[in-house]
Amino acid sequence: MKKNLKYLLALCLTIALVFSLAACGQKADETPNDAQDDQQTEQEEFTPANYSIAALKGPTAMGLVKLMKDSESGETTGNEYTFTLAGSADEVTPALLKGELDMACVPANLAAVLYNKTEGEIEVLAVNTLGVLYIVENGESVQSMADLKGKTIVAAGKGSTPEYALRYLLTENGIDPDNDVTIDWKSEHSECVAALASGQASVALLPQPFVTVAQSKIEGLRMALDLTEEWKNLAGVEPVQ
């Protein structure tokens, strides 16, 4: 009886092992097919598209450099991109509202305005620049925000981040931006650089890379104040620009 029981147990174990191996073999056979089906599904779902993107000259467009290069060399997975660089946000907004652009890099405050104006049809995807604004001077008289009192500052970006950041910092440092300083607004940052180069201005509000460009052209031009650090000194936190 014990002998028969041993044979029965051995037979059961053998049958179980056979079914186990068969199941493993079936799973191994199915795995490549499943992977192939997933790959085919992904290929079927991907449809190359043409995208029209606009950005402002300067730091706003710097984040697009790699995409521009990849698009030019055909390394963008089949998608095609058309890029437009503008001098001011006013040049971008109409095209964006008309649907002539798929994406645009604009000042943060304008992004909020566009979101509300289109009732959410235009959405914010990302913030791609932080801490790029500087006060530059051809001289040594500006060592703090307080030293800007009585100065003329050439700047670009009226109605957007540069203006709001500058006015806030001036006000918080006891300087009335409407009466204690003169802000000469230009339409583009390149005009500020030209004013510095010609000697028409000695102090300017500039973002990178215009600061570096200006320093390469104008001997003695220095970064007098880092607005990121000035904001941090007041608020105790990093600014979101």
Residue ranges and their predicted role:
Residues 80-87, 105, 177-188:
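Short beta-strand-to-loop elements that line the ligand-binding cleft
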Residues 19-23:
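C-terminal motif of bacterial Sec signal peptides marking the signal peptidase cleavage site
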Residues 109-110, 118, 183-184, 190-241:
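Pocket-lining segment of extracytoplasmic ligand-binding domains
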Residues 44-45, 137-153:
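Flexible hinge/capping segments at coil-to-helix
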Residues 66-68, 133-143, 235-241:
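A bilobed periplasmic-binding-protein/Venus flytrap-type ligand-binding module shared by bacterial periplasmic
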Residues 53-57, 150-161, 173, 178, ...:
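Short beta-strand->loop
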Residues 25-27:
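Bacterial signal peptide processing site
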